[in-house]
From Swiss-Prot:
GO BP terms in the entry: photosynthesis
Entry protein name: Cytochrome c6
Family statement drawn from the similarity comment of this UniProt entry: Belongs to the cytochrome c family. PetJ subfamily.
Pfam families, per database record: Cytochrome_CBB3
Gene3D superfamilies, alphabetized: Cytochrome c-like domain
Subunit structure: Monomer.
């Protein structure tokens, strides 16, 4: 997966609600490693499924983004979670 492409896609599609790995809609369910682990989302497979199909307040992006793009976003999210969202 291409995390550089994932970063650009994240900025364009996800950062409105998830800036800096946070969550402006549900503050408990951030993209930080601890929250991803707590909610069983700390895997590319889980992130890809949620981004593709949406859940709750989060819209589905499977219509707007190609599978490869969603994989790149998931790789970027996991990379950032591992690095504490410092970049």
């Amino acid at each position: 997966a291409d995390t550089v492409s994932g970063a650009a896609l994240f900025k364009a599609n996800c950062a409105q609600c998830h800036v800096g790995g946070g969550n402006l809609v549900n503050r408990a369910k951030t993209l930080k490693k601890e929250a991803l682990e707590k909610y069983n989302m700390y895997s590319a497979k889980a992130i890809i499924a949620q981004v593709t199909h949406g859940k709750g307040a989060m819209p589905a992006f499977g219509i707007r983004l190609k599978a490869e793009q969603i994989e790149n976003v998931a790789a970027y999210v996991l990379e950032q979670a591992d690095n504490g969202w410092k970049k």
